[in-house]
A protein has these predicted regions:
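Feature captures the catalytic cores and cofactor-binding loops of soluble hydro-lyases/lyases
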Residues: 42-175
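Short, well-ordered loop/turn sites that connect or cap secondary structure elements
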Residues: 28-29
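Short, structured beta-strand/loop micro-motifs enriched in basic residues and often containing a Trp
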Residues: 10-20
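Active-site/ligand-binding-proximal alpha/beta "capping" segment
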Residues: 101-103, 179-208
Length: 208
């Protein structure tokens, strides 16, 4: 669900609630500020490798990934009497998952990816083909982002992969991010890289 809003500074923020639909995703454009509430599912290297290579039956995965937002995050977790508490939940570098992401998006009908640093051409094409979107989270703000996680709903593969690499189901409220790769083929990361390369070439040319 998408709800446009403005914060106290007059900056437009799109309020999103998971699960997302294709219509929700197609309404988003690169550069949009978003606030995400609802279920977030974490997944790092081992989860992506497992989903891609082992191809588990969807009924064997305890969380519904259709319409889900997958967060590239290995949270720092504290075990409590009642369950688990998130101590830190910052994004990990997304490009390390480039080899897996396109197939995971298609196979499990993901509608959002949260991470850091953007992804490659293969993932960008998968975003367009499957109406999915990439959100850039705030790097270096793990404790701040953990405060946006209100509840740990469950965990999968913790014994096999360990806490950082397990798949966590988290209930978020007002999780901030920016759309940097949209379902229309726009990629802010690539745009900035191209602009930087052009500027660098100009500077080198001035010195020679």
């Amino acid at each position: 669900m998408v709800t446009p809003d403005k914060n106290s500074n007059g900056i437009k923020t799109v309020d999103l609630r998971t699960p997302l639909s294709s219509e929700d995703v197609l309404a988003l454009k690169a550069g949009d500020l978003v606030s995400i509430s609802g279920n977030l599912i974490t997944g790092r290297d081992k989860i992506h490798k497992y989903l891609t290579e082992q191809k588990p039956d969807k009924k064997d995965i305890p969380f519904d990934l259709s319409g889900a937002v997958l967060y590239h995050c290995g949270p720092l977790i504290k075990k409590t009497e009642d369950g688990y508490k998130i101590i830190s939940a910052g994004p990990t570098t997304s490009m390390r998952l480039e080899m897996y992401e396109a197939s995971v998006i298609k196979e499990y009908n993901l509608k959002g990816i949260i991470g850091k640093g953007g992804m490659g051409e293969k993932t960008l094409n998968a975003l367009k083909e499957n109406a999915c979107v990439y959100f850039q989270a705030i790097g270096g703000a793990g404790v701040y982002l953990a405060d946006r996680i209100k509840t740990v709903l469950g965990v999968w593969k913790i014994d096999e992969f360990g806490p950082a690499e397990a798949m966590w189901s988290l209930e978020a409220e007002g999780f901030p991010a920016i759309v940097t790769m949209d379902a229309h083929g726009n990629d802010i990361h690539r745009k900035i890289e191209n602009m930087s390369s052009k500027k660098f070439s100009e500077l080198i040319g001035q010195k020679t």
